[in-house]
Every structure is written in C-alpha cells, then in structure tokens.
Amino acid sequence: MKNGQWKQHRKRCNMLLTIKQLQVKYGKQTALQINSPINFEKGERIGVIGSNGAGKTTLVKAILGLTAYEGRIVTELKPEQMAAHMQSNAYVTTMPVKRIMEMILDTKIKDNKELQELITFFEFEGCLSKRYNALSGGQKQKFTIIMIMMQKAELTFYDEVTSGLDFETRQKLMEKMVEWYRDKEDSLIIVSHYYEELEQLVDKILLLDQGKVVAFGRTEELFRKYCGDAIFILDNNPVSSSLTKSFCALKSPNHLIALSCRDKEEERRL
C-alpha cells in the first residue's frame, strides 16, 4: 500500500461518523440544515452549542435515528453502540433508585466494581434508598449520567446535562464530568447552551444558529474568534455593572456578568 493510500485508509479507520447534506423538517419549517460535510473521529469530544431552537437536540435525534431526515449520516456504529443522555427520561418515579439501577443494568451494585466506582465518584451513595421522584434536579442528572457511563458505548451523547440546575450545581456537575473523562479516550458529543461548560471537556465546537452551522473547529480557535482573548465572570451587582459598562458583555445567567477581552491591553484594564 502506497503512503498516500495508507493515510487515507488510516483516516477512514479513525472516522466514527460523517454528516453529509443533512436536513430535518418539522412540517414546512426547516429545523436543521447542514450543507458541508462534518466528520467526527474516534476519541474526539465534540461540543454542540447554540441558543434555544438552534437545532442542537434535533441533530442528536437525527444521528440516533429518532427523527426523520434527508441526506446522509454515514457510520458503522450500530444503535446499541451508542448511548444518549436526553433531556427527558421516563424512569419509574415511585421506585427506589437502587432498584431502578439494578433492574435496568441487570446487575447488583454489591457485585459490580465499576458501578460502585461511579456511585462513589459522583457522591451518590446517599441517594440509592430514595425514590426517583424524591431526588433533586442535580441528583437526577447524576443518576442518569451513571446509567449512561455504565453502557461503555462507542459514542456517547449528553444533551443539556445541566438543564434546569442552579449555577453552583451546574458548575459542580461539570467539574465532575471533566475529572471523569480527563484521562479517557471516549468519543463524546455534548450539547449545551454554555461555552464555559464545554471549554475544558471538548476538543471541537459545532456552533449552530437557527438550524444552520455557524462554525465548526478547534475549541480554542473558536473561543478566540467569538469570545476574544479572555473572559471574565463577575457577580452582577451595581458596583460591577457600573465599572464594566465600557467592556463587551456576553450572554450569561442573570446573577453574573460575563465580559470578553479583545486583547491583552483590555484584559489588563479589566
């Protein structure tokens, strides 16, 4: 095999998924339109970011075969080789969490070291005896994440894993995710509204807006292009608001002020 042929062969072997000319419509409305090919390679962690209605969840559903689409999604993965954390999960609400976990995973916690490790890592031991409907929002997310991680899938999707959580709970949960995946080579597609959730966890960002691709590339490159050299996050109070009026503000939770610095001089001033 010639050198050029070998490179092409190796590239194909590393390719996990390719999207070609993808279109999703709900009635007459186009929810997602991807015109240029997008490639996902093994071991890559892709962050999909955009506002409500950008097409993020629609993309995940199309890849999983949960919604009709036109175009091509090329992959050798079978459905059972993919795992997905979706925004809504239909667990039995009145059953103890431990029983739900053991029934779905078909294993006993006391006999499964991997499951024990995840429960300990996410500090979930105190939740096992609770009924699902008694869990807090953050505890429910931890439960679903543990269930997803136990599948050890070739490709894992996380769709708005911090949806509905307060800022502190959201931060702590994402710190756990970053720590867990730090030294692993799992292939991930993570959907979020917030860039700061993805910054330490993903290699590339797919930025969607109104169903169209705005950009796709390395995380740091897109950060500099759309956010500047640095971002400062401050508590939103009258003093901070008054002192930072001349700087470029980014979208952020109501109790915070996020500011973009376009260069080192602006960063020094701030």
Question: Each PLM stretch: what is its role?
Answer:
Residues 88, 93-109:
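Q-loop/switch helix immediately C-terminal to the Walker
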Residues 112-127, 149:
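Conserved ABC ATPase "signature" region
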